[in-house]
Amino acid sequence: MVRLATEKDIEKVNDLRRQVNELHVKGRPDVFKAGFGQELQDFAYTLMNGENSDILVVERDGVICGMACVDYVCKPETPYGMARQFYHVQEIAVDEVFRRQGVARELFEFMKADAEKRSLSKIELDVWAFNESAIEFYEAIGFKETRIWMEYKL
């Protein structure tokens, strides 16, 4: 079952976010800081209480096994771009014990239905190139690559 996170869920949500952070530190130690300090932990409250953001959790048998931090984005038309309304996934995590058991797919199906209810036109996310298993999953459920960020190290 997917539902909105509550304050009682914050400890488990942050445990999942910590797992994501560790993956990113391992993949790009030149970009991400090791550890999961209080500021990162408190950010969950900001998302949960935000006007245009939420934290979703997947609960099975009373256990939170996955989560997603999402934003509801409405960008106005500009001289160089069209107006856009979309669902943005900031973070998504499945507890390592529950991976490959349909948790992420369940989250995605909820997000699709929720985005449609909110009259949002699409779901966007970004993923680091080192995260090959996530890329494989996103492609398998229908995400398409729309832009590529590159860097040139000096």
Regions found by a protein language model. Name each.
Residues 115-126:
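Conserved GNAT acetyl-CoA-binding A-motif
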Residues 22-44:
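Conserved GNAT-fold acetyl-CoA-binding loop/helix
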Residues 1-15, 24:
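A short beta-loop-alpha structural element at the N-terminal edge
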Residues 74-89, 99, 146-147:
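A conserved beta-turn-beta hairpin within the catalytic core of GNAT-like acetyltransferases
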Residues 57, 63-72, 88, 93:
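Conserved beta-strand in the GNAT
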Residues 105, 109, 129-147:
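Conserved active-site alpha-helix within GNAT-family acetyltransferase domains
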Residues 42-57:
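A short helix-loop-beta-strand connector motif used in the catalytic cores of GNAT acetyltransferases and
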Residues 91-94, 100-113, 140:
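Conserved acetyl-CoA-binding loop-helix of GNAT-fold acetyltransferases
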